[in-house]
A protein has these predicted regions:
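Long, highly charged, low-complexity intrinsically disordered interaction regions
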Residues: 11-80
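Short coil-to-beta-strand transition motifs
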Residues: 1-5
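Conserved hydrophobic positions within beta-strands
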Residues: 7-9
Length: 80
């Protein structure tokens, strides 16, 4: 699993960003809070990563803090 990524912030969209790590661009889904705290484009950024694998997709979710990541894990574990 990927636990953390550090690279250059290449692109930012609504709910996502692309982090370039040594020439590989990772599409990472993020909260608006995480995006708002991100530095300007082409600056270094580190994110804690939660990998979500399903039959039909492979998603990376990025967080500024481990606490925010833990809350995400709680939310996705709730049944119903």
């Amino acid at each position: 699993m990927i636990a953390k990524l550090t690279g250059l912030l290449e692109e930012v969209g609504e709910g996502w960003l692309i982090l370039d790590v040594k020439g590989v661009g990772y599409l990472i889904f993020c909260s608006q809070k995480t995006i708002d705290k991100a530095p300007k484009k082409f600056s270094e950024l580190s994110l804690f990563i939660e990998t979500h694998i399903r039959e039909d997709h492979f998603h990376l979710y990025g967080f500024n803090s481990l606490k925010e990541q833990q809350w995400f894990k709680i939310l996705i574990s709730v049944q119903g």
